[in-house]
Amino acid sequence: MTEPLKPRIDFDGPLDVDQNPEFRAQQTFDENQAQNFAPATLDEAPEEEGQVEAVMDAALRPKRSLWRKMVMGGLALFGASVVGQGVQWTMNAWQTQDWVALGGCAAGALIIGAGVGSVVTEWRRLWRLRQRAHERDEARDLLHSHGTGKGRAFCEKLAQQAGIDQSHPALQRWYASIHETQNDREVVSLYAHLVQPVLDAQARREISRSAAESTLMIAVSPLALVDMAFIAWRNLRLINRIATLYGIELGYYSRLRLFKLVLLNIAFAGASELVREVGMDWMSQDLAARLSTRAAQGIGAGLLTARLGIKAMELCRPLPWLDDDKPRLGDFRRQLIGQVKETLQKGKTPSEK
């Protein structure tokens, strides 16, 4: 039995196509290019908070220089000489029964003791301010840790430093929410969402009140010198209150150091953040056409005070910012504008009557 022949099939192109892969030309590096070679880096947005923390840590860390060591050595030698001479004078006055000289030695000892005590106290407060940056780094590590056993002790230490009583409702809710199966990241996150907002709310109220006072003072005061003195005094007082709120006791040098860090933080962040948060909305509302020049200056001074308070809050806070809990200038701007408008309306109402 024979099968019928199949019809012929014609193909337009050849069945086997010669595939010649294209290779890139060989590239070689000479000795000069090999020494200057550097791998390409991806264009990633720099993390502003990490950079600010690095700058803050570098500013807080004392610079170990040769001149500093020489000065410290000279002061130590001078102090030892003063103590030795004082002991010798005291012994001579006791042996010769020179009670006047003995009283002078006692007074000098009291003065020296008070000075040493003040130096030790200032150093301890400055050390406490430096430790806050390390605690913030430790909290950041715990928020990325899957271990157990360290988070609860760390949070209890923070609550004790802030002066939060064990019977506080927020702390009691945190104790009721944690259990042994949770890792350090979960424990610290619960503390950041249950206990830390209590202190943050108080700091926000302090910032809002100081910014409002600065705004109204500038808006109604006709003297620029008085305005500058008032703003400086209010800003220093705001920094002291925020530091005390977060459990940091400031001395003279630690207060100057914190104020310097706040200004450094503001300068490092640059004016882009201020323009981004305020500029567009400021122009859209056409405040220059609605408010007087003094009122606009008052709002600017209030925003500067608010920004100063936000940065002080960021430096004194023991935990890094999570999610969107960081306060923004826009939150205070709307309140300042409303207060200025209300004040101007109250001022116009009696004059119209």
From Swiss-Prot:
HAMAP family: UPF0283. PANTHER family: UPF0283 MEMBRANE PROTEIN YCJF. It comes from the Bacteria. This is UPF0283 membrane protein YcjF. Belongs to the UPF0283 family. One of its GO terms (cellular component) is plasma membrane. Its main location: membrane. The keyword Transmembrane helix applies. Keywords: Cell inner membrane, Cell membrane, Membrane, Transmembrane, Transmembrane helix. Disulfide bonds: none annotated. It is found in: Cell inner membrane. NCBIfam families: hyp_HI0043.
